[in-house]
Amino acid sequence: MQLRTGAASVVRTGLGLTQSRCAVQSLTAVPLERRIRQSKAFYHNTKKNDSAWAAAVSVAGNIVNNAVTKAIKGTDGLPTIDPLRLVAGEMKFLTGNIRKLLGSGHPSLDRAAKYYTQAEGKHVRPLIVLLMSRATALCPKAPQRQQSTLQASAAIDTSISPLNILSDFNPSDATPVSIPADTDILPSQRRLAEITELIHTASLLHDDVIDHSESRRGAPSANLEFGNKMAVLAGDFLLGRASVALARLRHAEVVELLATVIANLVEGEFMQLKNTARDEKNPKWSEETLTYYLQKTYLKTASLISKSCRASALLGGADAATVDAAYLYGKNLGLAFQLVDDMLDYTRSEKELGKPAGADLELGLATAPLLFAWKTMPELGPLVGRKFEKEGDAARARELVLQSNGIEQTRALAQDYAEKAIEAISGFPDSEAKDGLIEMAVKTLKRNK
């Protein structure tokens, strides 16, 4: 199978991700480890030369050699792969299945809970889960995981407790879902994709209340349509139904992973309440500021993608190396995705985004473009400290960011994380699904909303 320019070029030998490594083409670009030598900078404070900031500066200096950049250019004229086409059969049933999982005997709750499923969302997270499920189907299996894999797929619509207990005084319950035939994606992996979207949608409902959002996906936000109380309760209901579906997978490690995601979302939201670890009134720029931001970004965005990818490989019975590689792909892709999202807040209009543009500054949030700009523009410090509350603060901060190289630095760091995502799955056997995962990393950098 022929890959697009840049896709094959990031695949390298000697990384030790799996034992079933195909013959691959070596990188002609500057080796990744020479540009960014650590992948855990956002978990711990690090030495100056091994920090997230040092990595970002190094990445920006070598961006012309970046393999993902070459993939985006597509100089060989090959058509790009459409990841959605590869799992179209499963995605076709996604929204309908989710709505079946959300049935409630309370009409108002039913409408609020299903509100965001009516709009046409990107469904990026379930798409990634399904692609990962198909890509890891060809990878080595762990014999000790086969029994739990069979259990997880055998009874995803079967309750563990008696139904009369679960549905007492509630005339409506989750109903069996539609399953496409003749596919190498297991029923448990399809259900995982639906659970992932449920958790993500619940986080949108809660975030829109916290952020006082007025629009979502080009329509009035749920909090505007139903009020804050109903929106919060609807989000809680989605998490409840996701938890039930998760329990019925009957796979303890997967339950632990996705339950941790829900906790991570809350932890990340608490971290976002302040822009720096010390929350000073007149903070000074430091490398730890970017570390704090990346940790928050992992918790709020990358945790769901990374742990869902890992869970997908576990449900397929993959060996430990494949499971770890799936996690690394999701972690790095999730970080790249959010970095691009934060960049678009400065470069796109509300009409293009389908949600308010410039919202981060209005909410008092200092994201990557501003943090990079702050390094050379210390006058941003007092604005960050008071969370852009004074009249004109947000406009001034935006002006300074656009005058700096903050957006370019953010783009460079996002490209590096995308390359690391591609590198993580380089040991997977060649397949259309693997190519689709590579294309998802490329599309993450090219998206404009």
Curated annotation (Swiss-Prot):
Record pathway: Cofactor biosynthesis; ubiquinone biosynthesis
GO cellular component: mitochondrion; polyprenyl diphosphate synthase complex
Subcellular location: Mitochondrion
CDD domains: Trans_IPPS_HT (cd00685)
Gene Ontology process terms (BP): alcohol biosynthetic process; isoprenoid biosynthetic process; mycotoxin biosynthetic process; ubiquinone biosynthetic process
Keyword Iron: no
Keywords noted in UniProt: Isoprene biosynthesis, Magnesium, Metal-binding, Mitochondrion, Transferase, Transit peptide
Binding sites annotated in the UniProt record for an all-trans-polyprenyl diphosphate: R216, K300, T301, Q338, K355
SUPFAM superfamilies: Terpenoid synthases
Binding-site positions, Mg(2+) 2: D207, D211
A Pfam family that the UniProt record links to this protein: polyprenyl_synt
Positions of isopentenyl diphosphate binding: K122, R125, H200, R217
InterPro entries for the chain: Isoprenoid_synthase_dom_sf, Polyprenyl_synt, Polyprenyl_synt_CS
Domain of life where this protein originates: Eukaryota
EC number: 2.5.1.-
Entry's family note: Belongs to the FPP/GGPP synthase family.
Protein name: Probable hexaprenyl pyrophosphate synthase, mitochondrial
Species whose genome carries this gene: Neurospora crassa (strain ATCC 24698 / 74-OR23-1A / CBS 708.71 / DSM 1257 / FGSC 987)
